[in-house]
Amino acid sequence: MAKYLYLDQDECMACESCVELCPEAFRMSSAGEYAEVIDPNTTAECVEDAISTCPVECIEWREE
């Protein structure tokens, strides 16, 4: 099974830590209300750092 990067936008508190740590994989929404995954199939090495530092734990890998 393949895995993909998931971010729960309803839980996101828009702290921007994932965007700062891993701009290859995350960006802020146009309104700045939450972060977004740029590419769910990313292989960026910084993703694990973003997952572990998210204060509301809303980023995870999911199985397809």
Swiss-Prot record:
MF terms in GO: 4 iron, 4 sulfur cluster binding; electron transfer activity; iron ion binding
Cofactor: [4Fe-4S] cluster
Domain 4Fe-4S ferredoxin-type: 3-31, 34-64
Key word Transport present: yes
Superkingdom of source: Bacteria
Keywords: 4Fe-4S, Electron transport, Iron, Iron-sulfur, Metal-binding, Repeat, Transport
Repeat is among the record's keywords: yes
SUBUNIT field: Homodimer.
Job of this protein: Ferredoxins are iron-sulfur proteins that transfer electrons in a wide variety of metabolic reactions.
PANTHER family listed in its UniProt record: FERREDOXIN
Name of protein: Ferredoxin-2
Taxonomic classification: Bacteria, Pseudomonadati, Thermodesulfobacteriota, Desulfovibrionia, Desulfovibrionales
